[in-house]
Amino acid sequence: MSKTTDLVTADELERFPRDDRRYELVEGRVIPMSPVGYQHGKVVLQLGFLLSRYLKSQPVGVVMTEVGFKLEFGPDTVRAPDIAFIRAHRIPANTRGFFTGPPDLAIEVLSPDDRPSDVRAKVDQYLARGVALVVVVDPDQKTVTTWRPSTPPVPLRAEEDRLDLGDVIQGFSCSLREIFE
């Protein structure tokens, strides 16, 4: 940790012990992340699987889980969406450590203890830093909300509603039923 302040840098966060704890960094402050529950883990895996399967046939980028993205510097902010997508042309030669810059797509799956104000702040931060599409999935309500820059959020509630990521991952869509099965 820095001697002059209580703020932590992204480089310092990367050197934290790998002890199965997860952290995010918000304006230099370490935010511990709780372990996820059953529904959260199931939805992350299912949606990640759907995206991975599609990207095998259409290799336009890479999908990953819980990767740290350096979004702000001085003080540093590192966010780790539950699922993220980066277009192929943005993948750096050196993929060690946190990714510098925003993902093209950030997906957050809600946990029961997530506060709406915290989720909204995270969505706003992603959009302000250049994320093209933010998806918030609520496993308890079985709903999905999509957020794009300068447009109102779009809620999806019915099993037949389709999550369309075509503006980021061309051709990809799936029904809510597929996400929550």
Where are these regions (language model features)?
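Gly/Pro/Ser/Thr-rich low-complexity, intrinsically disordered segments predominantly at protein N-termini
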Residues: 1-181
